UniProtKB/Swiss-Prot annotation:
Main location: mitochondrion
Residues the record lists as binding heme b: H115, H138, Y208, K357
Cofactor binding: number and manner: Binds 1 heme b (iron(II)-protoporphyrin IX) group non-covalently per subunit.
Location of the Cytochrome b5 heme-binding domain: 80-157
EC number: 1.1.2.3
Protein name (record): L-lactate dehydrogenase (cytochrome)
Organism in which the protein naturally occurs: Wickerhamomyces anomalus
Amino acid sequence: MFKSQLRTATARSSFRSLASKLNPQRFNSSKTPLLNATRGSNRSKNSLIALAISLSAVSSSYYLYQKDKFISADVPHWKDIELTPEIVSQHNKKDDLWVVLNGQVYDLTDFLPNHPGGQKIIIRYAGKDATKIFVPIHPPDTIEKFIPPEKHLGPLVGEFEQEEEELSDEEIDRLERIERKPPLSQMINLHDFETIARQILPPPALAYYCSAADDEVTLRENHNAYHRIFFNPKILIDVKDVDISTEFFGEKTSAPFYISATALAKLGHPEGEVAIAKGAGREDVVQMISTLASCSFDEIADARIPGQQQWYQLYVNADRSITEKAVRHAEERGMKGLFITVDAPSLGRREKDMKMKFEADSDVQGDDEDIDRSQGASRALSSFIDPSLSWKDIAFIKSITKMPIVIKGVQRKEDVLLAAEHGLQGVVLSNHGGRQLDYTRAPVEVLAEVMPILKERGLDQKIDIFVDGGVRRGTDVLKALCLGAKGVGLGRPFLYAMSSYGDKGVTKAIQLLKDEIEMNMRLLGVNKIEELTPELLDTRSIHNRAVPVAKDYLYEQNYQRMSGAEFRPGIED
């Protein structure tokens, strides 16, 4: 009955109003081309979203790495002619292609062959208004930063007429789930946020967030490795007053964990990384800002409250002058640490993400011979990552900043020792959340191996060891801290919290994790972070992957299994 009513004009209008209040960026109005799909066309709509994600990914990086990033330019108008929808719509071919964004008309003809995200999404909107698909997941002024000023033709005069379209069954179901999601107060652990997010995110956005490399063995092992570590708690200890605060690089923080850098947060919520900044600020937890954020760096930095700490995650560009500008700007804006990603000379095969890109290709372009099957929202980023980055570049990076320098993506003890030799302030034991090389070891397993070596060589007090990947519980954080980690990073859990409930969801997730840490410190018999030592753990099974462990049903329930190839839909579909 609900679906039937939605298909009437009045009911659809009413539901749009409701959906706009629930999430104005996911569902805007009857003019929204993405979400206003005809019946049975959910596949096409998801394809457009997938293409937009690819465009967002590459343009975010391109935007950050333009040489004139910090230079403004005057924008000329096009021959003083009124750029009406009728005129713009005539420029809809590859050799004469205009697009409207934010009420402004751009000539993308010359840019089309060089667009790192591919030509398909631009061609799809040739001679049309692409604002609705572009704005929700891009930093402001992105176009102006990477399209030459002379290609900005001027303002659109008038509006494009939009066709009334009917919602698909799948989209109606998703919007109904958003309406029925439980109140924030019912979230009692980080798994709960993921459960909700998986039901309300558009499929391409979910695929981008949850995808991992190849068979996703490392993704699951990152979490499962914590199940092979058990506690040896102390008893009869006065634990009335427990303090979970710590210091990172000499700066006090309320908890021993931080929010890891993740790309394209606006896919889940219209405020994106700004929502994460707000939620983290309320709880005095460090946020690491991604190079590939969907909000601009300055937007995220501006969202800080006084005293709030943020770190900057960096992909090094082949043009070192571009990297230098970005690093110096981050330092000027008060970033407290520079985290250089070193595990991505090329981005991994994230097949859930790639399958969404395949659907987009088949809908936009009929000739399969021209489709680049290596692409997806993730791999589209790789053209901006310098594969020649090596240890010799550390000296250059140290010369351009006074921020503490940490390399993120270390996966073996030998490289931890090299980092110490190069005078780095820290490393993050990480495999990119299982999104790069599959069958790499879980970071917590590497942590258990490397810390005794550092202590033996007297290096454990000279370099900070951070760890991320697979963390879902306060007990996971405590296990890593007992093994010697300085801090523990979480990425996806906070994306899911933000996607489900915005900045308040981020705050709630932090509070839940803090509560778990404090409670379990009491049960362990410790009062301070400094009292967490290896003696409180039984790690005899950490390296033995054949040891059976109790199933984590909440984690398994949320894990989205990979699927094989699918046939094309039939005519009746």
